Every structure is written in structure tokens, then in C-alpha cells.
Design a protein with these regions (language model features):
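N-terminal twin-arginine translocation
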Residues: 2-33
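Short loop/turn segments at beta->alpha junctions
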Residues: 7, 77, 144, 189-192, ...
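An extracytoplasmic/periplasmic, membrane-proximal ligand-sensing/linker region
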Residues: 34-36, 180, 268-328
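Hinge/capping helix and adjacent helix->loop/strand transition within the periplasmic-binding protein
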Residues: 87-93, 108-195, 244, 257-290
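Beta->alpha turn/N-cap motifs
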Residues: 97-102, 163-164, 193, 210-215, ...
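A ligand-binding cleft/hinge motif common to bilobed small-molecule-binding domains
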Residues: 102-110, 176-180, 206-241
Length: 328
């Protein structure tokens, strides 16, 4: 039984328990006087960002004494939801859970983004980090990262590298792999992670760098092979798989992340309050258990630390992926 399958059942139980637990302290408030926090998820229901929001939402409500309403505003790689939050006034009491792609897309869109990161949207806190792995499908004759790179250099036309779309972690991490290895990899974007994995498993593409949260079940089943993990140390779920640096690709460290953002006009006092409450929720044993099963690790810290880290991430990927790439 895969760890991912177990995690889905655990998460569903946790979400159900959370909904029941929240009923007394928050819903008991007078509806006319209760403050509502709108938590926007810029992706469809069921993904890792959505599940994290539904685990944390009821607990945030309990600690804040507010009603938390989760709204999925999917589309354009997260830009639709992010644009809506960026346009909200501080009085709207709105926040967003965002994946890496949402914060790096405005930079690589070369001025085509409807909002400016760090001006129209400001970070509240980092939430979790998610390790990735370099994956190959059954049609690729490579047993190690070194063999994969050698194959990409020797095969006429190189190898096809799948992604979940422009600006996603599989895209930018793939571009970094191409840059550091010198291998010939051709980017093949897909409409989301599910399609990307389906094409990779089917042998219609050759390689992908993907979040372990979504690909671990396919590695465990043997449908995909992990040649390396992209973290600084080996992953407990895949102890026999080396890190990319151990496999000889120095400097190749990639981690996806989830973070909380608020409209740029949000007062600093409110940012600090939300930051503190999120950190408290993230320390709860049930939350730690659930995110661990999703291959996530807590990454909360002060507001200023979050901004410093996220600015560095935007700068890093802007150097890897040319401006305007997302519009190609």
C-alpha cells in the first residue's frame, strides 16, 4: 500500500474531524458580529494546496475566533486567484495559500502579469517545503542520473522533458537541470501534473522533475523510476535514491513550497497576527502527521524571514527561466 494512498485517507479523516471540532467555538458566534477570513486557493479542489488549506482552515478559525471560508479560484496556473486577492482592500480580510508557481510567474511573464508580487501581494509566512525527484519513464534506458545526462547529450535531439505547464516547478526545475548538466532536454508543457505524469508513465515523454507529494505512488508501484531527489539530504520514503548532488550534479537543490499571502494593503499588525497563528497550527501533532504523509515539512517563520526567502526564490528562478518564457 503506498504512503500516498494512506495519506489521502488520513487527510480525509482529519478534514472531517476538523470540521466537527470547529462547530462550537466559531459557528456559535452571532453571524452578524462574526468576522470572516476568506482563504483563497488558486487551484482546483483536491490538490496539495487545497488539502493543506482544508487541514489548516478550521484550526485557524478556532485560534483567530473568526469564520474561515475557503474559496477555490482556479485558472491560469494560479494567476486568476492571485489577481483577485491582489485587488482586495485590507478590509476584505482575505489571504491566499500559494504554490511556488504563483509567485514566480509574474516575473517570467515579462510584464504580462496583472499584479506585482511583493507590492500587490505580500507574504504572511512560509507554510511547507516539498521535495522533488528527477523521474524517468519505462522507455528511458538510464539507471542513474549520470546515465540520464549522458543519454541526453548523446541522443540526436536529446530527451523530452515534461512539465505541468509554464512556470511550474517541473518547468523551472527542468530548466535548471538542463543548465547545470549541459544535457539536451526539450521542454514539453502539459495541462497540469496529472497529464504530465500520464504522458511520462506512457512513455510519450522521457523525464520530469516532480514533487514527491504527487509522484511517490508511481515510484512505489514501479511505473516511474526516481534517479535522484532534489533535496539536500535523502528522503526517508526513498532511502536508496541519492540526492542530485550525491549523484554528481553539484548545485542542483530544488524544493517546492507553499506560502500564505495577503493583499499589499494589509496592516503589518494583521500580518504578524496571522503569522503567529499559522505557526501555532503548524505545531499541532495531527497537522504534523498529515503534512508528513504528504511529503511536506513545516517551514514557518517570522514575516521578514518569509519575505527574504521568497524574494530570493523569485530572483533565483528569474535567472534560470528567461523573462517572457511563460508566454511562449
Amino acid at each position: 500500500m503506498s504512503r500516498f494512498a494512506c495519506s489521502r485517507r488520513t487527510l480525509l479523516r482529519l478534514i472531517a474531524t476538523s470540521a466537527a471540532a470547529i462547530a462550537s467555538p466559531v459557528i456559535a458566534q452571532d453571524a452578524a458580529r462574526a468576522k470572516t477570513l476568506k482563504l483563497v486557493v488558486p487551484f482546483p479542489p483536491g490538490g496539495s494546496t487545497d488539502l493543506l488549506a482544508r487541514i489548516m482552515g478550521p484550526r485557524l478559525a478556532q485560534r483567530l475566533g473568526e469564520t474561515v471560508v475557503i474559496e477555490n479560484k482556479a485558472g491560469a496556473g494560479g494567476n486568476i486567484g492571485a489577481s483577485l486577492v491582489a485587488a482586495e482592500p485590507a478590509s476584505a480580510n482575505t489571504v491566499m495559500f500559494a504554490a511556488t508557481s504563483v509567485i514566480i510567474n509574474p516575473t517570467i511573464q515579462a510584464g504580462n502579469s496583472p499584479f506585482q508580487i511583493f507590492r500587490d501581494l505580500v507574504p504572511v509566512t512560509r507554510l511547507v517545503d516539498i521535495p522533488c525527484a528527477i523521474l524517468v519513464g519505462p522507455s528511458v534506458n538510464a539507471a542513474s542520473l549520470g546515465e540520464l545526462i549522458a543519454l541526453a547529450k548523446s541522443r540526436p535531439g536529446g530527451l523530452n522533458m515534461a512539465s505541468a505547464g509554464f512556470g511550474t516547478i517541473p518547468h523551472v526545475a527542468g530548466e535548471l537541470l538542463k543548465s547545470l548538466s549541459g544535457g539536451a532536454f526539450t521542454h514539453v508543457p502539459h495541462k497540469g501534473q496529472a497529464e504530465m505524469l500520464r504522458e511520462l508513465i506512457g512513455g510519450r515523454t522521457d523525464v520530469a522533475v516532480d514533487l514527491l507529494a504527487g509522484s511517490l505512488q508511481h515510484i512505489e508501484s514501479g511505473r516511474l523510476r526516481a534517479l535522484a531527489v532534489t533535496s539536500t539530504r535523502r528522503q526517508e520514503a526513498l532511502p536508496g535514491v541519492p540526492t542530485a548532488e550525491e549523484a554528481g550534479l553539484k548545485g542542483y537543490v530544488v524544493s517546492a513550497h507553499q506560502s500564505m499571502w495577503a493583499p499589499g494593503s494589509t496592516p503589518r499588525g494583521r500580518l504578524d497576527q496571522l503569522n503567529r497563528v499559522v505557526a501555532e497550527v503548524m505545531r499541532e501533532p495531527e497537522v504534523l502527521q498529515a503534512i508528513s504523509k504528504m511529503m511536506m515539512t513545516p517551514a514557518t517563520g517570522p514575516v521578514d524571514e518569509a519575505e527574504k526567502y521568497l524574494r530570493a526564490e523569485v530572483s533565483r528562478w528569474a535567472q534560470v527561466v528567461p523573462a517572457g518564457s511563460a508566454a511562449q
